[in-house]
Amino acid sequence: MTFAEWAAFYDKKNPEDPFSPTPGYDLYFVPEKGFCEVRFTETMAIIGQLTGDGRFFRDKVEEVARKLGYKEGGTICIRKEIRAYIRLFGYCIEREEKLPDGEIRYHARHKKTGKWLRASPMFRYKGSGELAYGVTWEI
């Protein structure tokens, strides 16, 4: 697919927040895989807007991050079902932490590597009320 086709696909899946390049992020496009924004802060590799093969882009970002000495990754998950997202990336939920506002933070561990992941409620979209999660993980 072309970049325009991938962007249209992103917009269809996320109509409340259509694609627009994020300042400070580098954009990577692979026609058969999709696109991904990435930013390296002082301490973390952050994946921004992404559409297509999330595992492919996560693996590529982690590969670069390891070479640069990064230990943590982060992203915002806008999927409707955070538990499915956690499983998709190979993690098993170890603990659900109920927060004061009634939302749940998920603590998970990767099934093969044993590395941790944490998914915390971040914000709700005004139109749909869908909850987005801030996700951090051990690289």
Stretches found by the model and what they are:
Residues V30, V38, H107-K111, Y133-W137:
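Short beta-strand element of the conserved SAM-dependent methyltransferase core
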Residues P15-E32, L88, A108-K111:
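Short, solvent-exposed secondary-structure boundary motifs
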Residues M1, Y10, F19-T22, Y28-P31, ...:
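Alpha-helix C-terminal capping segments
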Residues P21-R55, Y125, I139:
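Conserved donor-binding loop and adjoining core beta-sheet/short helix segment
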Residues T41-G90, E97-G102:
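Acyl-donor binding region in acyl/amide transferases
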Residues C92-K111, W116-A132:
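Conserved catalytic-core motifs of GNAT/GCN5-like acyltransferases
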Residues M1-D17, T43, E138:
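Short amphipathic alpha-helix that is part of the acyltransferase structural core
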